[in-house]
Every structure is written in structure tokens, then in C-alpha cells.
Amino acid sequence: MRTVLSWLCALFFFSYGAGAQSLSYTKADSLFCLQVLDSLKHSQTKDAGERMIRVARFFLDKPYVAATLEGEPETLVVNLRELDCTTLVESVLALSQPVSSFADYTEALRGLRYRKGKVRYTERLHYIADWMYENGKRGLVKDITSELPGSEPLPLSLSFMSSHPESYSALKGHPERVARMREVEAA
């Protein structure tokens, strides 16, 4: 019995550790998240747009920093201290979802940032058109371009990342990743 219990404890420990490796954040990030969620909990705001504006106001003093998601191996990066255009939108949208904990927030963020929620560099939604398409399929965003007067669709051809792998440390020297990016771009 003691052996079985020891194996179960070891299995739990290593499983937990493996999951923890795919998430990168600081204590400041989790505390900020909880502060935002607590504020929303005490709010009477039911309208999604008002909720997003309320969340976005928490980020007014945060600096713009590029490339905060880059690193090996690929992890779900939660950085609520520094943001770029896309990570700001992702953070606001994820915090505006019906989430009540840091774990809920990270799951919402993972779903927004990665194709089918798979945390891999080649499954990250690098292109904004791809991000809009994937999150539109899930009903999280809506492309209203066709509803705007005078708007015309533009042909879309994605190939920059697979054509310039030397510009991306995660692609440089990884032909299998470049091949996957080429598949993603062609889809």
C-alpha cells in the first residue's frame, strides 16, 4: 500500500511539474490578475463592451514592450506588466471573459493565443488575420469589415515567417517548424 501511495504521489508531483513548465508568469502577474477580477466581481457591469473598457483601464500605465512571448521552450507567457498591441488585446479579452481565478484566466488566454489551445510556437496565432479567423470561429471576436461602407476585401497571402525563418529564433535551424509554418500560412 505504501508503495502504491508513493507512486501516486510521485506521479502527481511530476505531472504537476510538467504542467507548470508550460506556464511562465510572476507573482506580480497573478496578483494583478486577481486585482482586476476582484474589481469586476464588485462591478454591476453586465455589458461585454463596458466590461472590456473597465479591464483595459487597468493597463493604462503599462509600458509597451515587444517580443515578450519569445523564448525556448515555448510556454504560455502571462506578462501583465509589459504588453504589445496583441498581448494587450489578448489580456483584456481574456480577463473580460467569465473567469474567476488566475487558472481560469490562463486557460482563456491559452485559447485566444494558440490554435486549438496547443502551446507550441507553430500553433501560436502569429498573424493577426489568423488570430481574427480562429477567435472568430469561437465567437470571441467578429470581423465587421464587410459591414463598413465602401469596404472591399483584400486578397490575403501569408508567407513571411516561412520565407524568412532566419528572422525568428524559434524557426532558425528548425526546418520542421518552418514546414509547419508553411502549412499554417497556406491554410
Where are these predicted regions, by residue range?
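Compositionally biased, low-structure terminal segments
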Residues: 13-15, 33, 161
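Functionally constrained cores in energy, signaling, and assembly domains
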Residues: 7-10, 47, 96
